[in-house]
Amino acid sequence: MRITNTLTGKKEEFVPLQPGVVRMYVCGPTVYDLIHVGNARPAVVFDVFRRYLEYRGYRVIMVQNFTDIDDKIINKANQLGVDPKMVADTFIAEYWRDAHALGIRPANFHPRTTDFVDDIVEIIEKLVERGYAYQTKTGVYFDVRKFKKYGELSKKRIEDLIAGARVEVDETKNFPLDFSLWKRAKPGEPCWNSPWGEGRPGWHIECTVMSVKILGESFDIHAGGEDLVFPHHENEKAQAEALTGKIFAKYWMHNGMVRFLGDKMSKSTGNIFTVREAVKKYGRDGLRYMILSKHYRSPMDFSEDLLSDYSKAVRRVWEILRRYESNGVTGIPKRNTVYEEYVNRFVEALDDDFNTPVAVSILFELAKNLSKSMEEGDQENALLFYHLIRREFGPVLGLFDLNEERREVAGESLLGILIEVRETLRKEKRYDLSDWIRDRLRENGIILRDTPSGTEYSVE
């Protein structure tokens, strides 16, 4: 297996630190709003990567954090006039609702920043003792010039860097790029006791501490969106390696950004399309298929029209599966040369820097062959193709492996029948019943539109 390591900029053979075990950390959301498709991309990508590692026989220990104290959470709480913890608790619950709808398997650990404050304080103290951090009247900062490998991950030199949009401006700092480890409390903000007075952790130290405490001083994979390479991941790496003197993460994986309406999808700009809306309108597998059809390191353009096309393609596969399952699925296929050929192609694709577009295309090829085998009465191959879709490759990709989409297909079929009944009633001028059907559907979020070419519907 070979993956592109952001640290080296090269495609490298993947060799875990401990044979047979993979320890990985994926940066999770800051919980102050519903997650959008941009947030869904790393969630889906690294959910599937974890599944594939398990398919290949590794035991995976996966950590995905929740940042549950942050300026954005505090600002949201102030806007709503509620406690910041209520904001975080609410949107962690909403995250799980959306993650479940999207078929994201829980990680082994989902730590919250606020559960690790004592550990964070302890590690900041060690960084201060070792000369990598210093105190000012506004808090504690990491001295980037003391860490000689700063910029190694992002390929940036300190001499070329200037304070940018995500670098805190503070005249009390020794150097503009020094970043906050501990923020002195402001009136009305959540705070904790520390040797430097009441305050709260900086953003970057949170992930360093949670990953080191759970996975150890060195682990295999650190992953997230490419927008996190600098400053977040660069700063995480600097803190951890200054603390331990060891390599923090052996491999760094980063997914490309999602572009929507010509720009990066981002909550801070309001340029978003929520996962909840996407799944409700176009289905779980439609969104997962869209994400996996692009190589994880490439940028991904998003639009409703594109998502609609992916959703339609998924529904065609579900219709093939439904036809096969309607006759009752029994038996286990033979492990023949056709089976071996497909497994080899699937593994070859995902072993090559996690090439999900090729892996997904194999799944759709199998669906086409399943349909053809049913038409030809080839029961042996039909069972084999079905098995590979539903029982083997589908569960790795998180596609066609649950029954929720079948219920969606059944729901659409039922809706089509209701529309036909309503059209018949209208032709018979039985408007009381036809209007009753229309109104009941509207109450359930389905809007009917009568056009010259027939009745169309949309989902609110």
UniProtKB/Swiss-Prot annotation:
Its EC number is 6.1.1.16. GO terms for cellular component: cytosol. Transmembrane segments: none annotated. A motif ('KMSKS' region) lies at residues 264-268. Zn(2+) binds at residues 27, 207, 232, 236. ATP binds at residue 267. Binds 1 zinc ion per subunit. A motif ('HIGH' region) lies at residues 29-39. It catalyses: tRNA(Cys) + L-cysteine + ATP = L-cysteinyl-tRNA(Cys) + AMP + diphosphate. GO terms for biological process: cysteinyl-tRNA aminoacylation. HAMAP family: Cys_tRNA_synth. NCBIfam families: cysS. This is Cysteine--tRNA ligase. It comes from Thermotoga neapolitana (strain ATCC 49049 / DSM 4359 / NBRC 107923 / NS-E). The gene is cysS.
